[in-house]
Amino acid sequence: MFIDGKWILREDIDVFDPYTLENIEKITALDREETKSAIEVAEKNKEIMKNLSPSKRYSILMKIAEQISLKKDLFAKTISIDVGKPIKQSKIEVDRTLTALKLSAFYAKELRGETINSENGLIFTKKEPLGVVGAITPFNFPLNLITHKIGPAIATGNSVVLHPSSKAPIVAIYLTKIIEHVLKQMDVPRGIFNLATGNGDIVGDEISKNDNINMVSFTGSVEVGESISKNAKMKKVALELGGNNPMIVLKDSDIKLAAKSAVKSKFLNAGQVCISVGQVLVEEEVLETFTKHVIEETKKLILGNPLDTKTDIGPLISPESALRIENLIKKSVNEGGEVLIGGNRQNSLISPAVINIDENNILSKIETFGPVLPILKVKDSEEAVSIANNSKYGLQAGVFTNDINKAMKIADSLEYGGIMINSSPTFRKDNMPFGGVKKSGLGREGIKYTVEEMCETKTIVIHNI
């Protein structure tokens, strides 16, 4: 809806507040031809973007960060209304966004090649942009996950087509207005950045298939990620997909700390986090104590209006998502699961649930993406690792133990992209490599690592004459 510096404004899609269920906005849904047009504009402007100096790319990113910083409260409130995220969590997301942009700006000046020794002359490499990056982002972190893609894209001199989730597009629109202002202020053609709102099966599909896109960076479901991978053919693809992230709690660990970490991490953003705790695997000797502490911590959580600063858990993104979680809980119970607390639904709200299950239960196999914390009893660390690895996912895992040798042995055995020792799988810093194995994705995010993904290495050889 923002193509070549012009806004296309229609009322095609209704956007709802997930808490009040009120219609808060109507946005444009681009058709396939309009999406192609956005991509063509980005392609035509890629040489302009490539030729911007590193210092200018740096300045663009720093000015975007500066403008967001001036409107931190507006962005935080918009995230909470757009997604249903508690306002205190939305404020953290805005702060992380500023970090991502500033890191991207730093790496804009740090792009460098290498010199290779040769007896016949000089060999050196340089980093060049790919061309056009298609960024497809989810609803759950509608600002931070955008900047994790467009920040490195701008830093490396790529033009951008951004396709945000149609469930939570308002933050992306506000961000685009800031980018428009900054590009105008710096006398840079607005066509280097294009916003393509609409339905994923049209806009996202065209981005993944279009030959003028040089890289697709996608965060979302496994099913859509697999479709993008097939459609992309020879273009570069970065996929950050789902996970059922295990947290292993051994008997020698700080049980109270582990319980607090599990509850805080599981119910962040109502469980709608790709690295949310998927299941807790607890050694049987400490299961009762751990479960007691988890229930105590869960009872402290306040469910309700995301704009209330006291709220810990807001709604899921839609009543349909909440109904899906309610049905998953019922299925889990039918398979032998025992609900210890919570699990009650009202519209888009689900009270935080803790459920005892075994390894054959559905909650041990899938990505829940909701406020449900499954607990499994295991006899030892070997059984915990075996259950954790018996998964199609491999994003992140957590291990709680006071024995560093045991922790390192488990970390080596777990088939996951990231292992957090004495922390939950939900831990992430914006400058660390982030990504999974198996069906949890391809490539790594984290600003430095995304910058590397969004470059080509060109080799130049100067022969002696």
Curated annotation (Swiss-Prot):
The active site is at residues 240, 274. CDD domains: ALDH_LactADH_F420-Bios. Disulfide bonds: none annotated. Keywords: NAD, Oxidoreductase. PROSITE patterns: ALDEHYDE_DEHYDR_GLU. The keyword Methyltransferase does not apply. GO terms for molecular function: lactaldehyde dehydrogenase (NAD+) activity. InterPro entries: Ald_DH/histidinol_DH, Ald_DH_C, Ald_DH_CS_GLU, Ald_DH_N, Aldehyde_DH_dom, ALDH-related_metabolic_enz, Lactaldehyde_DH. Pathway: Cofactor biosynthesis; coenzyme F420 biosynthesis. NAD(+) binds at residues 220-225. It catalyses: (S)-lactaldehyde + NAD(+) + H2O = (S)-lactate + NADH + 2 H(+). Its EC number is 1.2.1.22. It is an enzyme of class 1 (oxidoreductase). Homotetramer. Involved in F420 biosynthesis through the oxidation of lactaldehyde to lactate. NCBIfam families: lactal_redase_Meth. Belongs to the aldehyde dehydrogenase family. This is Lactaldehyde dehydrogenase. It comes from Methanococcus maripaludis (strain C5 / ATCC BAA-1333).
